[in-house]
Amino acid sequence: MKTYVSNEYDVIVVGAGHAGCEAALASARMGEKTLLLTISLDMVAFMPCNPSVGGPAKGTVVREIDALGGEMGKNIDKTYIQMRMLNTGKGPAVRALRAQADKWDYHEEMKRTIENTPNLTLRQAVVDDLIVEDGECRGVVTNTGARYRAKSVVLTTGTAARGRIFIGELNYSSGPNNTIPAIKLSESLERLGFKLRRFKTGTPPRVNRHTIDYSKTEEEPGDKEPRHFSFTSRDEDYLTDQTSCWMTYTNPKTHEIINENLDRSPMFSGDIVGVGPRYCPSIETKVVRFADKDRHQIFLEPEGRKTEEIYVGDFSTSMPEEVQLEMLHTVAGLEKVEMMRPGYAIEYDVVDPWQLTHTLETKRIKHLYMAGQMNGTSGYEEAAGQGLIAGINAALSAEGKPAFTLGRDEAYIGVLIDDLVTKGTEEPYRLLTSRAEYRLLLRHDNADLRLTEKGHDLGLIDDDRYAEFLAKKELIQEDLDRLGEITVHPTIAVNEYLAGLGQTDLNGGVKADVFLRRPRVTVEDVERLTGQKLAGDRYVKEQVEIDIKYAGYIKKQEIQVARLRRQEAKKIPKDIDYDQIEGLATEAREKLAKIRPETLAQAERISGVNPADLAILSVYVQNGKYAKVQK
């Protein structure tokens, strides 16, 4: 095809899913002239699978995105139809906020934000090729022949890269939700030497809300107490007219139908070669893998206020359409349900993420960044977190400024990216609280304290919001100091309160911060029992209470972080030749040469590098033997 020279930009972002939107907004807000290209303007920030944001670990990522100046938290706070805090009976390290989204409002609100952002141009186009000159990415070429030049390019292709949809025996080339797939871009990446592989994900059927018998299901309402993802959202704006979700279960009859039709499932017939997600398996996989279970939970989730569609959560399937309907009709409450869209599996290309650095720049091509599902992750939140980091670094690169990264001790986003570039992934990667060694430091409640300063330094947090943040920090310290001054006396009221908690009496006066360390004692209880009011609002009090109750555990993790940072400070030279280092095990040598860790701490986290290998590498790097080998 004949090409023509179109406009020139500082940063080009390819793909306008959750990763692409964050990348483009970050770049534009940092002052870079940015172009956001999408296969379809109707798919901007679209939710092709579950209509929700947040959950364990993921909800904290959304708070981190917001603390850094990203958009996902603000957008969901404007468009949710239900909000719930999960794991409230557990410790603060695993509490998680989850919102049910109006997926259509979410898309429209994000598109409106992008269209009204200075420095940002949104355009519909299919990117077929990259412009690469002397090992540097300098733009893209579309299927209409337009050549857009840029200083940096961010790829966020999602599941569109050579996407193929499967519904029983039917399969066809397609992106998510029957959009155009991106075929030639994958071929371009392969020509440039990138290693691609095939992953698979899936989505469940959507059913008509009016054909459900809700009397046979269990209602899951939202929280009455105000909850927000964005630190800028106000309690007075909290939605009180929330929409319920509903829960039901599969049963032995459902499982019987699935087992009878496994030969028609592309997951089991061999038609699908891509690796599926471990933590979000299809209903067929669950029935086969957990044959001892006679039922599996199903959640019925509204997709919005202006649609009749209900998402049948935890019922992902690629069975033939008529089998899907037969399966649904066995479920309590769904006996007469009408299916509006069948579920499907989608297979797509991903780039092995060990080919990236912690900035999400590729090692092979400079100024080329990748983010989202094309890096092997699953989930909107993981994609958005990567998109934000890629967009920040693309903007910094365009200005010739130092890169920005987050460590495992600083954010779940840091854990996510480090896992990807250090360990790679053999299946769609899902972020879990268990993946974070320092999860007591990486909580939902303190994301602003961890990251707002960084967002302000980057130019993504304005001065007014930064002033509010500093005021909150001052109030936290003021209330911590105040609790160290207030005395709780052993009054009748105090000891009756303790007896109600099943605790021993107070025999003498103690400082309020010491009293607060007792189990189930809250800041509000201390205020009531002492008659002393603290200065902060409920969010400040929450922070103060956690800081006091978990002080010992937090201190322990801070000591571990200090050790990590000492190891992170020990840089490995980029041009080190691992073949010249004697004593390394063969597996360690191969893994180190493939991943090329930047620090000794990263090398330590590589599977296959044992303590003996690390000790040898440490000696070579720290004692100057590296230099001798080079000579």
Curated annotation (Swiss-Prot):
Belongs to the MnmG family. GO terms for molecular function: flavin adenine dinucleotide binding. Coiled coil: none annotated. NAD-binding protein involved in the addition of a carboxymethylaminomethyl (cmnm) group at the wobble position (U34) of certain tRNAs, forming tRNA-cmnm(5)s(2)U34. Keywords: Cytoplasm, FAD, Flavoprotein, NAD, tRNA processing. GO terms for cellular component: cytosol. It comes from Lactobacillus delbrueckii subsp. bulgaricus (strain ATCC 11842 / DSM 20081 / BCRC 10696 / JCM 1002 / NBRC 13953 / NCIMB 11778 / NCTC 12712 / WDCM 00102 / Lb 14). The keyword Cytoplasm applies. Homodimer. Heterotetramer of two MnmE and two MnmG subunits. PANTHER family: GLUCOSE INHIBITED DIVISION PROTEIN A (PTHR11806), PROTEIN MTO1 HOMOLOG, MITOCHONDRIAL (PTHR11806:SF0). This is tRNA uridine 5-carboxymethylaminomethyl modification enzyme MnmG. NAD(+) binds at residues 276-290. FAD binds at G15, A16, G17, H18, A19, G20. Residues 214-233 are annotated as: Disordered. SUPFAM superfamilies: FAD/NAD(P)-binding domain. Its cofactor is FAD. The gene is mnmG.
